[in-house]
Amino acid sequence: MKENQKQHQVFIEGAGLSFTISENDTILGGILRSGVGIPYECNAGGCGSCKYTLIEGDVVDDFEGSAGLRSSDKRKNKHLACVSRPQSNCVIQINPDAQYAAKTHPKRVNATLQSVEKLTHDLWEFYFQSDHSARFLPGQYAKLGLPGVAGPRSYSMCNNANNDGRWGFQ
């Protein structure tokens, strides 16, 4: 996390839980990194599984036209945790559930693009090198922020976990 990013406290009403996140991080990212479990699937605003009610505070929704949020939800001050970012301290209402707690907590990793290969007319494979081991479980994916691309996008890892810091994606 960059030092110049504003930090905000997010309180989960009724659960006695809170966490601190950057205003550039999503509510879902903060929830998962804090070890709290909530239902979520797409992590991109399409499914609506991570819906919460904003009780106090201000958030920015990165995907206003999200299929996961109806106009009736918006009138009830509902937002999607995966595409909303805090702009102040917030109080939210969501139902934590231990069955959804992450086995590994998401973390930010900086890496350098090492190679790109076109596999088919619409499939590319690319590898990054980081200073940290590439530890992940089957089925996990990474949200990558790439220069020139609006917003992060989810990519599946295509290599095996390793201690060399090599991350492959398709």
Question: For each predicted feature, which ranges?
Answer:
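N-terminal pre-ligand scaffold of iron-sulfur
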Residues: 1-39
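Intrinsically disordered, low-complexity Ser/Thr-rich linker and spacer segments
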Residues: 97-105
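Ferredoxin-reductase
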Residues: 105-170
